[in-house]
C-alpha cells in the first residue's frame, strides 16, 4: 500500500460522483419531460416511437398498469433473445459459423441480459455470432438499463404527488431514457474508446502468425460500441471471456479509468436525478454520503487485503510485496481493488481481474457489497429505488423508538409501505441462501465445482449472490454451463430483478395517493449525520447480518485455513 494507490482509488470513486451530479440534473429533466438541448433532434424521433406503438405519452398509468407494461415488455424481450440464440446457426451475420445455443444456455443468457445481470455461462468469442452480440445482447444492454431507470422515475412521482392517481407512463419513460440518456452517452464513450484502441469491426477476426510458426485466430467484434453501454448501462457482460481484463476491451490504464468511472456514473446520476425530481436534494445527498462511505470502505478493504503478501507466497519464499495473482500488470492492485468495489457495489459485474484469485477476505468483501442490495450506487434507477426502501425502513425504526408514525420525503410511512419494503429486501437473501443451500448438497450441482472445502462453498455462494443481485460477476472455478446451474440461476436472476421492482412500484402506488405533508416539529430530519448513521446501520444489519453464517462457511473459514496452513508449514 502507498499513497499513490490510495489516490488512484479516491480519484476513480470521486470522478464517478462528480460527473454523476450534472448528469443527474439532466436525467431529472428527461424524467420530468422538461426541455433539453437534444429536443430539436430527438423530439421527432420520440414522436415516431409513440405513433408506431400507439402510445399516449401523456396518459399516466396506475402502479399495476405500469408494472404490467414493464413485465410484458421484458417477457417479450426474453422471448426474442431466446429465439435468436437458439436459431443463431441459421441466421445471418455469423462469419464465425457458430451453431445455436442449447436450450438451458439460451434460457440463462436471455434472462441474464433482460434482467441487467449479464451473467455469462459461455465465452463470447467462441459462442456468440456477430448478430447475436449486436442485435440482442447489446440491445438488451440498453433496454434493461432503461427499465431500471423507469422504476426510479415512477417512485419519484409518487413522493411528489399530493393525493395523485398515476405514477407515470412506462413506455414514455423507457423511450425517453433510452433516447436522451443512454444512446447519446454511449455514442460519445464508444468514439473515445475507438480512439484509444478498442476494435470496432464486423469482421470475424484476423489470423496471426506466431513466433513459433503456428497460425492463431484472433477474434474481433464491434467491441467499443458494446463496451460503452456495457459500462454506462451498468450491465457488465463482456464480448470476450476475460471481460475487461482482455486487452481488446480494456487495453490501457486510461481506458481502465474511463470504463471504471462509467460503471458508477449513471448510478450516481440517478441518485441526484431523484433528489431534484422530489425537491429534496439535501435528503438524497444524505443517501449519497451513506452509499459513498460504504463503497469507500469496501474498496479500502479489498486494497488492503490484496496488498498483503499472500501467506502461501511467504511460505514458498517468493519475493513479492503484493498479491498479483489474477491481476493485470498494466493495472496493478489499486485499480483492481477500485474496480472490484465499484462493480459489486453497483449491479455491473464486469471484471478487470479474476475475483476467484482475490485473497479470501477480498473475495468475501466483493460478496458482501452485493449482499447490501446493490445500492452503492447500484443500477440506473434500481439502485436509488432500493436505497429509498432502506431509508423507509430506517425512518420506520426511528419511528418505533419515539412512538410516532414515520414520515419520509413528505409522505407518511405506514404498514403497507413497510411490508413492501421488507418484501423488496428479502428477495436477495431468500433466493441466494435457498439455492445455495440446495446446491451445496445436490450431487448434480456439485459436479460444476472446481474446488472443494470453503472455496467451493464461496463459489456456490458467489454465483447465486451475483445472480440474485443482478450483478453477473463470478468466481471462475464454477462450471456453470450445465442444466442445473443455468436453470436455477436464471430463476434466481428473475426473482432478484422483478420481485423488488414490483414491490417498489406497489409502494409507489400506495404513496402516490397520500397527501403531501409539510415537515413538523416531530418529523425526523433525514439529511443530517444522525440519519446517515442510522441508514448505514440498517443497511449493514439487513444486508450483512443475514449472510454472515454463509460467509463464515466460505471466505472467513478459508482465510483462517490459509493462515493455519502457513503457520504449520
From Swiss-Prot:
Its main location: membrane. It is a multi-pass membrane protein. Keywords: Cell inner membrane, Cell membrane, Ion transport, Membrane, Potassium, Potassium transport, Transmembrane, Transmembrane helix, Transport. The chain crosses the membrane at residues 5-25, 65-85, 135-155, 179-199, 254-274, 286-306, 383-403, 422-442, 489-509, 528-548. It is found in: Cell inner membrane. The keyword Repeat does not apply. InterPro entries: KdpA (IPR004623). GO terms for cellular component: plasma membrane. Signal peptide: none annotated. One of its GO terms (molecular function) is P-type potassium transmembrane transporter activity. Belongs to the KdpA family. The system is composed of three essential subunits: KdpA, KdpB and KdpC. Part of the high-affinity ATP-driven potassium transport (or Kdp) system, which catalyzes the hydrolysis of ATP coupled with the electrogenic transport of potassium into the cytoplasm. This subunit binds the periplasmic potassium ions and delivers the ions to the membrane domain of KdpB through an intramembrane tunnel. This is Potassium-transporting ATPase potassium-binding subunit.
Amino acid at each position: 500500500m502507498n499513497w499513490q494507490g490510495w489516490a488512484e482509488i479516491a480519484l476513480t470513486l470521486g470522478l464517478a460522483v462528480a460527473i454523476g451530479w450534472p448528469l443527474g440534473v439532466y436525467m431529472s429533466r428527461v424524467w420530468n419531460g422538461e426541455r433539453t438541448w437534444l429536443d430539436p433532434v430527438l423530439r421527432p424521433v420520440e414522436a415516431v416511437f409513440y405513433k408506431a406503438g400507439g402510445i399516449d405519452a401523456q396518459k399516466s398509468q396506475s402502479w399495476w398498469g405500469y408494472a404490467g407494461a414493464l413485465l410484458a415488455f421484458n417477457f417479450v424481450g426474453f422471448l426474442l433473445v431466446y429465439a435468436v440464440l437458439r436459431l443463431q446457426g441459421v441466421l445471418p451475420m455469423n462469419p464465425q459459423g457458430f451453431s445455436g445455443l442449447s436450450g438451458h444456455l439460451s434460457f440463462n443468457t436471455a434472462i441474464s441480459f433482460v434482467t441487467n445481470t449479464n451473467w455469462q455461462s459461455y465465452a463470447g468469442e467462441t459462442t456468440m455470432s456477430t448478430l447475436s452480440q449486436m442485435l440482442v445482447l447489446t440491445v438488451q444492454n440498453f433496454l434493461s438499463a432503461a427499465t431500471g431507470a423507469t422504476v426510479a422515475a415512477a417512485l419519484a412521482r409518487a413522493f411528489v404527488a399530493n393525493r395523485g392517481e398515476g405514477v407515470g407512463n412506462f413506455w414514455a419513460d423507457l423511450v425517453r431514457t433510452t433516447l436522451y440518456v443512454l444512446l447519446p452517452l454511449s455514442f460519445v464513450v464508444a468514439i473515445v474508446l475507438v480512439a484509444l484502441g478498442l476494435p470496432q469491426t464486423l469482421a470475424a477476426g484476423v489470423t496471426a502468425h506466431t513466433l513459433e510458426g503456428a497460425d492463431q485466430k484472433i477474434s474481433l467484434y464491434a467491441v467499443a460500441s458494446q463496451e460503452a453501454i456495457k459500462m454506462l448501462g451498468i450491465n457488465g457482460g463482456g464480448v470476450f471471456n476475460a471481460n475487461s481484463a482482455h486487452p481488446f476491451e480494456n487495453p490501457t490504464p486510461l481506458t481502465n479509468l474511463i470504463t471504471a468511472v462509467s460503471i458508477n456514473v449513471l448510478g450516481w446520476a440517478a441518485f441526484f436525478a431523484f433528489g431534484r425530481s422530489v425537491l429534496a436534494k439535501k435528503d438524497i445527498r444524505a443517501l449519497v454520503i451513506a452509499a459513498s462511505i460504504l463503497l469507500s470502505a469496501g474498496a479500502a478493504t479489498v486494497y488492503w487485503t490484496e496488498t498483503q503478501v499472500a501467506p502461501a507466497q511467504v511460505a514458498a519464499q517468493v519475493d513479492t510485496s503484493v498479491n498479483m495473482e489474477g491481476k493485470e500488470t498494466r493495472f496493478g492492485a489499486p485499480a483492481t481493488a477500485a474496480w472490484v468495489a465499484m462493480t459489486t457495489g453497483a449491479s455491473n459485474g464486469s471484471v478487470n481481474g479474476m475475483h476467484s484469485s482475490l485473497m479470501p477476505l477480498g473475495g468475501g468483501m466483493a460478496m458482501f457489497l452485493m449482499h447490501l442490495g446493490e445500492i452503492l450506487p447500484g443500477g440506473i434507477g434500481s439502485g436509488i429505488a432500493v436505497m429509498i426502501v432502506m431509508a423507509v425502513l430506517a425512518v420506520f425504526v426511528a419511528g418505533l423508538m419515539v412512538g410516532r408514525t414515520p414520515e419520509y420525503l413528505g409522505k407518511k410511512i405506514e404498514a403497507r409501505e413497510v411490508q413492501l419494503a421488507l418484501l423488496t429486501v428479502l428477495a436477495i437473501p431468500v433466493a441466494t441462501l435457498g439455492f445455495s443451500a440446495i446446491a451445496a448438497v445436490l450431487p448434480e450441482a456439485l459436479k460444476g465445482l472446481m474446488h472443494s472445502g470453503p472455496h467451493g462453498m464461496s463459489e456456490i455462494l458467489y454465483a447465486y449472490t451475483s445472480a440474485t443481485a443482478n450483478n453477473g460477476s463470478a468466481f471462475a472455478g464454477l462450471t456453470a454451463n450445465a442444466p442445473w446451474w443455468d436453470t436455477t440461476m436464471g430463476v434466481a436472476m428473475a426473482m432478484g430483478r422483478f420481485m423488488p421492482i414490483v414491490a417498489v412500484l406497489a409502494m409507489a402506488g400506495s404513496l402516490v395517493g397520500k397527501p403531501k405533508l409539510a415537515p413538523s416539529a416531530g418529523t425526523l430530519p433525514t439529511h443530517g449525520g444522525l440519519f446517515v448513521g442510522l441508514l448505514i446501520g440498517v443497511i449493514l444489519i439487513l444486508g450483512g447480518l443475514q449472510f454472515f453464517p454463509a460467509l463464515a462457511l466460505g471466505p472467513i473459514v478459508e482465510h483462517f485455513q490459509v493462515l493455519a496452513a502457513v503457520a504449520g508449514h
